[in-house]
Amino acid sequence: MNRRTFLALMAATGAAGAVGNASTAAHVGGEELRDLPEVSSANGILDYELNVVTNPLELGGRQVTLETYNGQLPGAALRIRPGDNLRILLKNRIVPVGIPTNDVFMLPYCASKSNDARYDTRRACLHDFWNRWERRQTLAQEAIDTNLHTHGLQVSPQDPGDNVFLQIGPLNDHQYSYDVPTDQPAGLYWYHPHFHTATAHQVWNGLSGPIIVEGDIDAVPEIAEMRERTIVINEMWIADDSAEVPFTLVAPVAGPVPFVSFPSVPAAMYVPLNGQLLPDITMQPGEAQRWRVVAATPHRSIWLHVEGHTLHQIGTDGIPYASPRPRPHIMLAAANRAEFIIKAGEPGRYRIYAEAYDQGHPGGPRPRLPLATLVVRGKQVNSPMPSTLVEPPRMPDLPVVRRRTLVFSGDITGRTGMGIQFLIDGKEMDHERIDTEVEAGTIEEWTLVNEDIFQHPIHIHVNPFQVVDVQGIPPGDTSWNTEPDVWWDTFRLPPFGRYTLRMYFRPDITGKTVYHCHILPHEDRGMMGTLLIDPHGQYPGGGP
């Protein structure tokens, strides 16, 4: 059967059954938020074995089967210091789950609609089905190969460092070795898989864990006395019948779950904190705690609110501030981290939630999402709050040598004949192509332009950046932090908007890496580009 015959047949039959909209998972709550296990460096070295395994776990009173790091959800917190050598032996022991295994399963692959009449996802699905039909033998490989990314660490992208182009097959091991620079800012980073086309599937399983770089901010007297909590927010998509993460195509819609699946897989979305659903976080009245929060979400932005409390932010994406900045709420796009101090108010129970937010999906915003409960009780205390912190990194006083424009676009209609696509400069990701070439030791400004209805949180590997201009913020949207001195490694691109970032390519790190949308289904569908960092003085173009 050729492609034309197949498409005609599927169109005539209505592309089989309709896609079911996943429901919000039933939750349990009331348990105290648990601390994650931690592993710390000693004598300048952290040597750790990370087993990627498929194992049963309990999630909200339900037995599920997930891919995990060492059987834990999420993985252990790795504590290191600037100048350390971080050695991770990654062992791939994934057992494939949730994969289409025969043509009977795959025939009902395409169906139905999104919740917005402007988007004809059926046509896109037909093309995607055909592409997968032609390469269906690779589906299992896409699901069970893996690798590792140390998100935010300013380390070499070359082997044995943060090489995201590696493909580590089942029963294979790989020894990573990361030389953490002596000037790595002290703060919160994280690790997760980065195998292109399967990244979303693996992070939906909960494959993630925090990396804490200790340093000067930890010695601030008031902070040193505080209770510290590291909180990983996962977003987990679990099928109702198999209790596994489905391996299917997804198309965006509105509602509790941000997409429909092809083939239709009735499923529920769970958003646990440290592997727990709706936990309690207990504090004494007047107590100040330091919270480190990572949005290890493949898709959803977390507009974090704590009812009745101010969040005194002390760092973003691992890089500290000079002084605390009080905020009524903090927006965490997928992959962002925020560190803040919270001082408990009067005794009582206070909601911790992600406020309803419109990421640009057809049909409207994601609804409000409860995350946890702050429980204030016990003896009154009065924890001191710091007024100053540490000197943050400064942008070097160098000229901007080059200015570039990158255009981000998407198509979920299938009208291009290429299926569901997310593109940069009109191109899907190609590992063999160099999309952008830069010179270490220089500063560039990039203007990112969004021709899409969706927000795209753009992540650049290795080097953080500062945002100097944002245009197109939706009217009335108060979630944006546009302070020009804040450093980011992931920043949201407004729908049909743009922003300009300024980035210093540190002189001691060269090699090939990537930049991409951190809505991981978008990255898997093509919205990623390759970045080659040349040694200083060896940029082939010479001057600007």
What are these regions (language model features)?
Residues 8-9, 17-49, 110, 115-131, ...:
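Extended terminal and domain-junction accessory segments
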Residues 479-523:
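C-terminal structured "cap/appendage" subdomains that terminate the fold
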Residues 3-175, 254-291, 319, 391-445, ...:
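N-terminal, post-signal-peptide metal-ligating segments of extracellular/periplasmic oxidoreductases
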Residues 307-320, 451-485, 520-523, 532-537:
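Active/binding-pocket-proximal capping segment
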Residues 155-163, 167-171, 237, 246-394:
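Histidine- and aromatic-rich segments of cupredoxin/plastocyanin-like copper-binding domains
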Residues 174-178, 279, 328, 336-340, ...:
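Short strand-edge motifs at loop-to-beta-strand transitions and within beta-strands
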Residues 91-95, 294-299, 449-453:
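Short solvent-exposed strand-capping/beta-turn motif centered on an Asx-Ser/Thr pair
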Residues 171-188:
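A conserved hydrophobic secondary-structure block that centers on an alpha-helix together
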